[in-house]
A protein has these predicted regions:
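Conserved small-residue
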Residues: 27-90, 96-110, 116-122, 129-176
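Histidine-centered active-site/metal-ligand motif
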Residues: 3, 74-77, 201, 279
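Bacterial N-terminal signal peptides
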Residues: 11-22
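N-terminal secretory signal peptides that target proteins for export/translocation
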Residues: 1-8
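Sequence context surrounding c-type heme c attachment/ligation sites in exported
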Residues: 24-32, 117-396
């Protein structure tokens, strides 16, 4: 029996039951207070049948302007708040109410042989199970005491995802849609454990609480199709639904994928989302003295002509974080281009190198001028995207 046939057989009864229930009552998501459901289905976020995984109509699909890279996985992100609750905008950040449930489902398109396909994510609002493989769904829920992170791993039949607080791994083989002649890549996809979830979602160490990284005000300024079909900024969708009291003021966030922008702005936007949650003055990587949020005060704090202080062997025997005009001599480029566990950055969330991201950082460093032999921070700071005044707060 094929993978799809087995899934169809196992979910036929479930689909029939859901149809019967739909005729009797409207299915709505559930907020489970101070508990950890073992099955993803207990949250009632999705309609799952033999053809697709689709968020319920009352659940909003969201997409951050600058997504995190996770081994070229596609992601379906959702947001839901209990009826009668509303988030507040406080200092341009969203303060979500107790009961808010965020989810992010990681999946890949697959070919007939079961290989996962490296292809651009088109931002689908549902997942077609006939040509996709579900890997994991991460749930971030706002409890009374703060945010709680729950990793759920999908079974092989794609009928249910189960809580795995210790994480998991999945061996995968990836082919590239744009170049079929490229040899397939075998790698291990790692589902983070509970502590690793906390490590990234806690941007103020050691005593700060977890919070979202993508579903924040600055990352939701991009336009998207809402559940009602309207194409508008996602923040305005939340306000229209009554889920947010007001929209933040100011321009939309730069996207690192927007090739019409100057290379410096794109590079800062990329580093902010991929690295800024740790590399900020209060983050887990504060001992490095490296600020990659885009809110650096000097070029040196961004890494220009800055010697490493906490990189260990991960520096690749290089002298400076960024050497203007020379990416091959820059530790920043070296670490994002590495896939070795003791060298790569980010150190969690990937097994593969984000080739497009590395190319962006390489091009940007190549445009920088100046010399580390004659470093002048005031001279370098205003060049090629280092101007602190143009930086925006883009991570929580």
């Amino acid at each position: 029996m094929t993978h799809s046939a087995l899934r169809a057989f196992l979910t036929k009864g479930l689909a029939s039951t859901l149809l019967l229930l739909a005729g009797c009552t409207e299915v709505t998501p559930s907020f489970v207070a101070d508990a950890r459901p073992q099955r993803l289905s207990e949250w009632n976020l999705f309609d799952l049948n033999t053809q697709r995984l689709q968020p319920l109509p009352v659940v909003e699909v969201v997409k951050p302007t600058n997504p995190l890279f996770t081994d070229y996985a596609h992601k379906l992100r959702t947001l839901w708040m209990p009826e009668g609750t509303q988030a507040r905008l406080v200092n341009d950040e969203i303060d979500y109410p107790v009961g808010t449930v965020l989810s992010k489902t990681f999946y890949y398109p697959v070919d007939d042989a079961g290989n996962v396909i490296r292809v651009a994510n088109q931002g689908a609002r549902e997942i077609n199970l006939a040509d996709s493989r579900l890997i994991e769904t991460r749930v971030l829920v706002r409890q009374e005491a703060g945010w709680d992170a729950l990793p759920y791993v999908w079974n092989e039949e794609e009928t249910e995802a189960f809580l795995r607080v210790a994480g998991a791994s999945r061996p995968l083989t990836m082919v590239t849609a744009a170049s079929p002649e490229t040899p397939a890549t075998q790698f291990a996809y790692f589902v983070p454990n509970e502590n690793q979830c906390s490590g990234c979602h806690t941007t103020e160490h050691p005593d700060g609480g977890m919070h979202p990284l993508g579903a924040i005000a600055s990352q939701l300024t991009a336009s998207s199709h809402s559940a009602s079909g309207e194409f508008q900024p996602q923040i305005e969708t939340l306000v229209a639904r009554g889920w947010l009291d007001r929209a933040p003021q100011g321009p939309a966030l730069d996207s690192y994928e927007d090739t019409s922008l100057p290379i410096g702005q794109r590079a800062l936007a990329y580093l902010n989302m991929q690295c800024g949650h740790c590399h900020n003055p209060d983050g887990a990587a504060d001992t490095s003295g490296l600020v990659l949020t885009g809110r650096h005060k000097t070029a040196v704090s961004m890494g220009v002509c800055k010697p490493p202080v906490a990189a260990g062997g991960g520096a690749g025997d290089l002298q400076y974080g960024i050497v203007p005009g020379d990416p091959d001599s820059s530790i920043l480029h070296y670490r994002v281009a590495s896939a070795k566990p003791d060298e790569m950055m980010p150190e969690l969330g990937r097994s593969l190198v984000h080739e497009e991201g590395v190319a962006l950082i390489r091009e940007w460093i190549g445009t920088l001028t100046g010399s580390c032999d004659e470093q002048s921070d005031s001279r370098i700071a205003g060049e090629s995207g280092f101007e602190p005044s143009v930086a925006k707060k883009t991570t929580g």
